[in-house]
UniProtKB/Swiss-Prot annotation:
The gene is dapH. SUPFAM superfamilies: Trimeric LpxA-like enzymes. Its EC number is 2.3.1.89. This is 2,3,4,5-tetrahydropyridine-2,6-dicarboxylate N-acetyltransferase. It catalyses: (S)-2,3,4,5-tetrahydrodipicolinate + acetyl-CoA + H2O = L-2-acetamido-6-oxoheptanedioate + CoA.
């Protein structure tokens, strides 16, 4: 998968065919239905389920109303431009409930925990963990062997296309419920304390915290021991 810059993402979304995917449970004289090519069906006897775009399914249901006794419809998107990613493409641990859009790069042995949200164009390096409920906005970049804490937000930048994305270098640890604003660069080996609001670049091998975040100290042996990442959690 190729890396996308802002203009590529804008072009992708702008030109994509917008879809409203639906799943419909149907009951009736299903053998009498004339199903168009754009709808996939799984029928058995007088009951079954079908999948398709609402633009195709709605007229189909109306045209076949006489042969449909009842139906129940499920729908979780409207005019969506970006599908969900095919998770099978990644050599990573991705837990149930993670929301990952198409066109996201995820390195080997990365870990994406429950409830994490990863938007289009984001990049996650090898061995990095995105903890529960963390949000990576569009084009956010996370290097190798990082830990992005639960509830943390790495702000996304798709528009304007000239804006710089958030960049987190290798070996960075960010505590829970922190926020890193657009264009901020967090240097290699840095630690961002829980709850920090990071509005400016962070130097490598430093600890920052507070609102707004300020340098607290340089990384020392005590800090390293408290922020050690465990390779066993990244085993597949």
């Amino acid at each position: 998968m190729a890396k996308l810059d802002a203009q590529s993402i804008i072009n992708y979304i702008g030109s994509a065919k917008k879809k409203t995917p639906v799943k419909v449970y149907v009951k009736g004289a299903l053998d009498q239905l004339n199903v168009p090519a754009g709808i996939k069906t799984f029928f058995s006897g007088n009951a079954g389920v079908l999948f398709g775009d609402w633009a195709d399914v709605e007229p189909f249901l109306k045209a076949n109303a006489a042969n449909i006794e009842d139906y129940e419809l499920e729908n979780d998107a409207r005019n969506s431009a970006v599908p969900m990613a095919d998770l099978k493409q990644y050599n990573a641990r991705i837990e149930p409930g993670a929301i990952i859009r198409d066109q996201v790069l995820i390195g080997d042995n990365a870990v994406i925990m429950m409830g994490a949200v990863i938007n289009i164009g984001a990049e996650i390096g090898e061995g990095s963990m995105i903890d529960m409920g963390a949000i990576l906005g569009g084009r956010a970049i996370v290097g190798k062997n990082c830990h992005i804490g639960a509830g943390t937000v790495l702000a996304g930048v798709v528009e304007p296309p000239s804006a710089k994305p958030v960049q987190i270098d290798d070996d960075v640890l960010i505590g829970a419920n922190a926020a890193v604003l657009e264009g901020v660069h967090v240097g290699k080996g840095a630690v961002v304390a829980a709850g920090a609001i990071v509005i400016e670049d962070v130097a490598p091998n430093t600890v920052v915290g507070g609102v707004p975040a300020r340098k607290l100290k340089d990384i020392d042996d005590k800090t390293k021991s408290k922020t050690e990442l465990m390779a066993e959690l990244r085993n597949l």
